[in-house]
Amino acid sequence: MKETNNQAFIDGQNLYMNTRASGWTVDLVKFRIYLREKYGAQKAYYFLGAVSEENQGLYELVQTAGFILVFREHSRAMIGKKKGNVDTDIVFTIMSKVIDDKDMKDVILVSGDGDYFKMVKYLIEKKRFCKLLAPNRHSTSSLYRVFTPRYVGFLNDKDTKKKISLAV
């Protein structure tokens, strides 16, 4: 792909849980290269839940692979009591960048969660959406079936999986 200023936004828990459920693991270094080369993602934001001491190794791995880590804000009382739930943070960040970052071209979203449907539809209508990359076909929200393959892809498709899978 020619040089663009697309930006990727990854729902880290959705990516991890849905590839793991399918029996494979994403190599984050390969994945970051794939996003840059295939979709022109100059920046890639990796959203996770609250910061946890036990996940320091993961955080280093994500950053070393070239992702920008974004954590969910929680009050001290809520930490450890619920899932990451980064959906609202991702939507807010994407829409803020679409409005405020005049250099950003299009959005790449990595998630199969239907909570993003209205935003994806809106961004497609406004010609600001590149691709939804769902971790796997089987756990992707049925809402996305209305979009053509131009806008929706699956990371567990044979060719893509081969490019980004962690060698076992």
Regions found by a protein language model. Give the residues of each.
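Terminal and domain-boundary accessory regions
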Residues: 1-168
